[in-house]
Amino acid sequence: TGAEPYDPDHTCVVVHTGGTTGSPKGVMLTDVDFNSIAQQFGAYEKLFRRGQKLMNIMPPFIAYGYACGVHLPLVLGLTVIIIPNLDPEKLGALIWKYKPEHMFGVPAHYQQMASSLLLKNKDLSFIRNYAAGGDAITVGAEQSVNDFLAAHGVEYGLAKGYGMTEVSSAATAASGLANKVGSVGIPLVNTLVSVFEPGTDTELPIGERGELCISGPAIMKGYYGKPAETAALLRHHSDGRVWAHTGDVGYMDEDGFVFLDSRIKRLIIRHDGFKVFPSMIENVISRHPAVQQCSVVGCTDKDHVQGRLPFVYVVLDPEGDKKKRQIVRELRQLCKEELPEYVQPVSYKFISEMPMTPVGKVDYRKLEEEITPRDY
């Protein structure tokens, strides 16, 4: 019998969202969605060459892990090395064993790589494109990873990307020399990314913060069995296009690079209406040499009937020797020097490690739930 007729709207998989800011939903992704991701990354021909290796450390049952870690490399003729149930402590050994030119992971993976004792004096010049997605990375953490890569003979810094399950994982990419520290790259070749007044189709000018929206060939078919939720995310604008409203706040610079601030749901709104972006604080605190990782969440404003205040969780560098009280004083001074008064954190809490979701994202909801009145 002949092949089945081609149906561009055929649902290939139903993938569940990560659920860090809401209940998980089944996302229907089509054959065209996945193929378009591979075809768009194929434009980076100087980075991806047939016969190279890609080590997939992401779960292949999420959109990021399958689209970028399995389908994309196979379409481009790469060999895929799948690492099931990755033990982060063994990441350095796996990189040295397989020497993959390419890897897609989350920021925590690259921080783990940069702290690997096994890789400390190794030549890693075989690395071509190691990319971070799935979660935000602070400027301080990105610079630390870039310093590690440069010191080990790697030509390019950490590549970053941005997307969501609803757009088949990727809408922007920063790789090779097309990269700016702090950005998540430029839109993929057939994808439009723009900034709108949240919840509307009013486009904002360059440099102004608003809701990041995406239009292109990799947008989902819809949420399985949830037409209302589908209509809320996929909206028809006056330009005739369908735009996915991401719920993320960011802006675009004059060179077309996209900068991500935070989820709209992560915004901390004070009692006086001022809005605090967690990333503003995280990017300052992460530059302190004693800080290995940090996350900012909102806590109840005990002095007012409404509003929330920024609260900082900090994971310290285990090799540091300063006392916590001294570090807090230095962090407060750093924030005072570089941030407006209304953005100042109300308190700092030191923890041994960040709680993570099963797909490697910081579990911000759990962090918020663990704050007690005694903490601030």
What would you call each of these model-derived segments?
Residues 35-53, 61-104, 108, 112, ...:
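Conserved AMP-binding/adenylation subdomain of ANL enzymes
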Residues 101-105, 114-181, 192:
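Gly/Ser/Thr-rich phosphate-binding loop
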Residues 180, 194-213, 251-255, 321-328, ...:
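Conserved beta-loop-beta connector loops within the AMP-binding
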Residues 186-190, 202-235, 274-276:
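Conserved ATP/PPi-binding loop(s) of AMP-dependent carboxylate-activating enzymes
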